[in-house]
């Protein structure tokens, strides 16, 4: 059972910087993740919040809620949220960080991730396909 978390501003997909993030919406992404989950024979729950504390609680509670893996796009929290980093580090579940855009090809401040080091891996710049790759990886390691 996978938990897919999307952080701040990802509710604005399709509206915010379509040249960077594309024209598809968060709802489109969630539908795709659910379809990919069905192909992988894994149930998927998608959640989004603009609030750091809510994301922290979802990460902290994931295992006791029965989730076996976590895909997270922390949004801008990637670059400065040590609280989110610590929540991920304290989680026993495998976690993969995903970014729709290539953060290393963007502004300098986006090049640093404080969360990636405590994740199993980081996928960046592959659009929505990055979520699928993260899900495939988790399906493989959770077999």
From Swiss-Prot:
Biological process according to GO: amino acid biosynthetic process; aromatic amino acid family biosynthetic process; chorismate biosynthetic process; quinate catabolic process
CDD domains with a match to the protein in the record: DHQase_II
Active site (UniProt): 21, 99
Pfam families for the chain: DHquinase_II
Keyword Amino-acid biosynthesis: yes
PROSITE patterns according to UniProt: DEHYDROQUINASE_II (PS01029)
Keywords attached to this entry: Amino-acid biosynthesis, Aromatic amino acid biosynthesis, Lyase
EC category name: lyase
Residues that hold substrate according to the record: 73, 79, 86, 100-101, 110
Coiled-coil residues: none
Reactions performed catalytically: 3-dehydroquinate = 3-dehydroshikimate + H2O
Molecular-function annotations in GO: 3-dehydroquinate dehydratase activity
Listed pathway(s): Metabolic intermediate biosynthesis; chorismate biosynthesis; chorismate from D-erythrose 4-phosphate and phosphoenolpyruvate: step 3/7
Site (Transition state stabilizer): 16
Documented EC number(s): 4.2.1.10
Family stated for the protein in its record: Belongs to the type-II 3-dehydroquinase family.
Its job: Catalyzes a trans-dehydration via an enolate intermediate.
Subunit relationships: Homododecamer.
Protein's name in the database: 3-dehydroquinate dehydratase
């Amino acid at each position: 059972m996978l938990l897919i978390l999307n952080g701040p501003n990802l509710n604005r997909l399709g509206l915010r910087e379509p040249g960077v993030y594309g024209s598809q919406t968060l709802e489109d992404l969630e539908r795709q993740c659910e379809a990919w989950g069905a192909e992988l024979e894994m149930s998927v729950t998608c959640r989004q919040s603009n609030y750091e504390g809510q994301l922290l609680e979802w990460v902290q509670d994931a295992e006791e809620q029965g989730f076996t893996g976590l895909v997270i796009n922390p949004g801008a929290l990637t670059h400065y949220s040590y609280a989110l980093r610590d929540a991920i580090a304290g989680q026993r579940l495998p976690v993969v960080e995903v970014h729709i855009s290539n953060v290393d090809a963007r502004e300098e401040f986006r090049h640093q991730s404080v969360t990636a080091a405590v994740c199993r891996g980081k996928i960046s710049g592959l659009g929505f396909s990055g979520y699928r790759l993260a899900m495939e990886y988790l399906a493989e390691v959770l077999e």
